[in-house]
């Protein structure tokens, strides 16, 4: 990922370029420009369900048959002077909560950092809401026009300031039909032609600035760069979309080759989640590692287009069974086994997440949504043995309807080197970046984990799901887990601390976030809190070791492991754009209230309070406040 810091397993992710975990300085790849320095700094708030019920004004909103009207009236009531528009990606989650997303507008232009999400409960009333609308003095109406030369110059500024590996000297902007954006032609080095449009964005001082939002997909990074529209040289912020018959594979639950043997699985797909199976998109049957959810292949040359022509196995009878040896020194010799493993793990995880609520309406990854809502056309491009780097992996998540990319690299920390596609924890970590990016702020807004704290939580959610899924039947709350131990060749893994409920093994608390300016160590703290919640709920409800959950008549997972995974997922959909630890905690508590009536509040609060995120915890970007107290009467 060259001229700047890349988000990846082993490097420190830039705004939404995400990757596998990394242990501080080990495996760090640096660029000339640090994208973390350009992360947006936008204040956000989350009003949880308890606060909504206590507010005498909010319940006065008339209950109506149309929840969209209730949501719109709330936004107008909270911010009566604001202009806004409803984004088209609203949906009803599997817990019955409807999610509506609004974008602030000023002088007819979007405020890209101004988002308002409203959650409407099953009873038709406001459940909770999040808000990052700009509340300061509005600038005068712009005199600048949507000028083609200015749009092209904005791209040149982005290339120069960020040292992007592309050429824009001859760039020419052309109005995009049916849109107020410009397509910029006559460039080289980008996967697709860049685009630019005028928007407003908050600068580092909290002022609203007119800017060109320049979108560039340069393979390793997919960037939104906000270039000041007045002087054309200052970059205010950067968002990166970059923090799968029969298959002979390491089966679900086997995290890496040290934990078990490869087996041959027959038709392991879940028909409810993948109604076409794993080798059809509903119109065409495929005899290769291609289907509705993903397209898997090698990418040794680090190419950025032509994915359909990349090397992948083909089998007329759909028998994807290929040899693999840990002793093999030439990783290309087992490429087909690697492709098959990545295709299997990714599809299996797609199906599990669909069962838990990450479905078509919520913005999951499918070519054909089959009338189930959301936008299709976005299966995952699954690159194994990717030639774009080593000792790393990443997942690039654009908005719903555009296909994301997973790039799995070879790791050279051992001899022979190791293929990260055989480490299920790494694959799940990467795919979970797509989950958290699509759910937070709505499927059409992939830039809602762009602050340093929310980006860190993105890493934490990815570690959490990778860890929860690999729990073994004999595990107890005394069981500790590393992240990336096999691929790194180090039993400590690549995180600062093991995931453990022991405060001696892992002493991290909320205020430790103050000492970090990178997302992976922040994510280690967030995932440590979720690990506490996980074991509290397992101790209460037991642990289902099957590959998918059982649900009661109300759609609640019957065991603690899958219940925690469900609540964390639902919390992502409730929380505001760019959440903090505090607002994300509140969203998980609200998710339990929506799903179970709040029957697990005590266990959830105990898990967070143990590590300093109790009732009195306070967020400040430089000086956070610990609290180990529980709310009165919660237990």
From Swiss-Prot:
GO terms for molecular function: metalloendopeptidase activity; zinc ion binding. The keyword Nuclease does not apply. It comes from the Eukaryota. InterPro entries: FTP_domain, Fungal_virulence_M36, Peptidase_M36, Peptidase_M4/M1_CTD_sf. This is Extracellular metalloproteinase MEP. Binds 1 zinc ion per subunit. The lineage of its organism: Eukaryota, Fungi, Dikarya, Ascomycota, Pezizomycotina. Residues 1-19 form the signal peptide. PANTHER family: EXTRACELLULAR METALLOPROTEINASE MEP. It is an enzyme of class 3 (hydrolase). Its cofactor is Zn(2+). Induction: Expression is controlled by the prtT transcription factor. Belongs to the peptidase M36 family. Zn(2+) binds at residues 429, 433. One of its GO terms (biological process) is proteolysis. Residues 20-244 form a propeptide. SUPFAM superfamilies: Metalloproteases ('zincins'), catalytic domain (SSF55486). The gene is MEP. The active site is at 430. Pfam families: FTP (PF07504), Peptidase_M36 (PF02128). Glycans are attached at residues 287, 302, 336.
